[in-house]
Amino acid sequence: MLKDIFGKKKYATITLYKDNAGPAVPSNTHSSKSNGNPVSEMKENKRMGARSRIAALIDKDTFIEYDSELESCNPLSFPKYAEKILAAMETSMEKDAVITGEGTIRGESCVLCVMNPDFMMGSMGSVVGEKITRAIEKAIEKKLPVIIFCASGGARMQEGILSLMQMAKTSAALGRLGEAGLLYISVLTDPTTGGVTASFAMLGDIIIAEPGALIGFAGPRVIEQTIRQKLPEGFQRSEFLLEKGFIDQIVSRKDMRNTLASLLRIHRLGGEMHA
């Protein structure tokens, strides 16, 4: 499968699925900002809402959402945080910044976590960490692979150390997933930064990125202000990270469903051969 470990294209193109049949919208979709028209959001330069992304990936009527009732509180009584949560709920029509569940992609079962950039820029607080951890634990229980679509500005500052703790919690859960011999695919979208990059985003067995996605810890402006130097053109973009070996493959949105289905199938068939 490895084509050129020192080149920009580390994986050969997988063409197990060649048809152009489109996915259907999951039966539990919301009418909201984060669930726009999946077709209109397939353009690479437009950030994609979580519901639209699920609609573009998951087979019709197969998505079962986990923990949809969980919502953020204000554990540290951070000023105006409660108001920001309510505003984010109203604009996104979601309770927090990640949707988790299970379904099939071209018949291949998986647990899917999709971060929602429409909710406080996908920042990771206690609810995000808890939902992702529970989803991973469910995958271990059901012996299913995990796919996480990352889109985040980082840890949610209004929750302080409780937010930072989610980095360790999600990473530990992924460690248990690996010990169980299960696949984890991380998909990095624009932007993937901060504490999410420093935890589960970069722990995938296979790390995929969308074209042109901003991926890093601190943002480019912060780095430039700190080191007082101009960064190279394209620094922290997915193409730069592929060239430097930090990610495995860049996949466009139109090819994402087929690529993920093929990887899931290869892993499943490989597991069956060694069972």
UniProtKB/Swiss-Prot annotation:
It is found in: Cytoplasm. This is Acetyl-coenzyme A carboxylase carboxyl transferase subunit beta. It comes from Alkaliphilus oremlandii (strain OhILAs). The keyword Signal does not apply. Residues 23-47 are annotated as: Disordered. Keywords: ATP-binding, Cytoplasm, Fatty acid biosynthesis, Fatty acid metabolism, Lipid biosynthesis, Lipid metabolism, Nucleotide-binding, Transferase. Component of the acetyl coenzyme A carboxylase (ACC) complex. Biotin carboxylase (BC) catalyzes the carboxylation of biotin on its carrier protein (BCCP) and then the CO(2) group is transferred by the transcarboxylase to acetyl-CoA to form malonyl-CoA. InterPro entries: AcCoA_carboxyl_beta, Acetyl_CoA_COase_Trfase_b_su, ClpP/crotonase-like_dom_sf, COA_CT_N. HAMAP family: AcetylCoA_CT_beta. Belongs to the AccD/PCCB family. Its main location: cytoplasm. Pathway: Lipid metabolism; malonyl-CoA biosynthesis; malonyl-CoA from acetyl-CoA: step 1/1. Acetyl-CoA carboxylase is a heterohexamer composed of biotin carboxyl carrier protein (AccB), biotin carboxylase (AccC) and two subunits each of ACCase subunit alpha (AccA) and ACCase subunit beta (AccD). Residues 18-275 form the CoA carboxyltransferase N-terminal domain. It catalyses: N(6)-carboxybiotinyl-L-lysyl-[protein] + acetyl-CoA = N(6)-biotinyl-L-lysyl-[protein] + malonyl-CoA. Residues 26-38 have a biased composition (Polar residues). The keyword RNA-binding does not apply. One of its GO terms (molecular function) is carboxyl- or carbamoyltransferase activity. Pfam families: Carboxyl_trans. Its EC number is 2.1.3.15. One of its GO terms (biological process) is malonyl-CoA biosynthetic process. It comes from the Bacteria. PROSITE patterns: COA_CT_NTER.
